[in-house]
């Protein structure tokens, strides 16, 4: 035993000496460093090291001078392996400033004119070091890149506030969450007495657990329940997030006996109105198809043939207003296209959301719809060539003009050209969409309405007048608001005064006749709203 103890002590002593030698060698070769300074000027990046406890990425002016002292460095704490104690305020805002001209301008210069490959590599190394430093300080935070007027780039982290619900701390005197020593003694005494008296069967003990009686254990149970109620009553819910361009007010209660429950406003602009009522959407569809096939934008379950899907959405036989009294039949001889959310009339920003909604609308609109078998005279669906209830309408010759819209003999199919799409492709798209949504609970109610914008405004006017006449207590409807067409709004509105706010127009009444007279259709099938 003595020999083993001596051997272990000798081994520990040798290990301590080796660690001291390694630490001494590390100190002589590379002194402890706790921050990095990256100086980048006109494509040249120089990385220096200092001995303070902060990370600085400084910049000089864009003139290309080597005086890095003229820059204003921004310091922020960095966790270093050689730092033993970290201050509590080291989790503050972390910034790194890279002051250079644009990389595009540098790469456009000739190698002989103040620019070389080595300088570009040095610049890239300095920028990468700044990114790595920020990620090391706050690996789970977002970054925001801000460009200054003098073509500098400021990389800021921890700019998004973190919301947390505040829960008051209850002390032991008020909470009563745990039973005191006396209650524990009583419970132990009752349990011992019950065991001495026989205790009863397991079923009786289960019943006693489910419904506690008025015995010594009841006050403790009630106190625990009271603590839960206090926590539930004192907890403050997180503030509701405002949706941009949709919700006007987040109001859910009023000061009188009525109720105010309304959905998001459906905001459209003049450009949205013109594109929604136009039958020619070739330019918009081509802009979508130009980027939609980029790898990584769509998921594996999305439809592969995007062109056929957009054909069904924008100019298919079920993409027009389903009302028999549509204003388009009187204006142009054919119904107007059905109204879609405004993201379908804007440049696409999120292709995943765009495609998922497009597939949902196609699935709902073409539910139970089948294209007829192609005839030898017509093998393509050039402008709605895949007609449905019209029987042999697929064999009809379709005019090439985008304004040549017409209704077939059945009165429910419209033929408007976008681009020739074969019927086989349309059937495959419908089969793929039905295979994705069939048998699943999908929000089909918002997409089930096939109504144009003017018919929707007419129905909104009727609903507004009915609500004003009947003094409805509950309103659950999302009214349409055209933001830059104030000339078409009448003086008749159903308004409500919110507490502490001015009058809010909930259901504006639009002059549909004035909107209809302001529409002008050109030969290309584009509609212009002259208001």
From Swiss-Prot:
Coiled coil regions, renumbered to chain: none
Record field: compositional bias (Low complexity): 50-82
Disulfide links within the chain: none
Chain intervals with Basic and acidic residues compositional bias: 9-33
Domain of life of the native organism: Viruses
Ranges where the record places region Disordered: 1-92, 167-216
Keywords linked to the UniProt accession: Early protein, Host nucleus
Family: Belongs to the herpesviridae UL95 family.
Protein name: Protein UL95
Gene name of the record: UL95
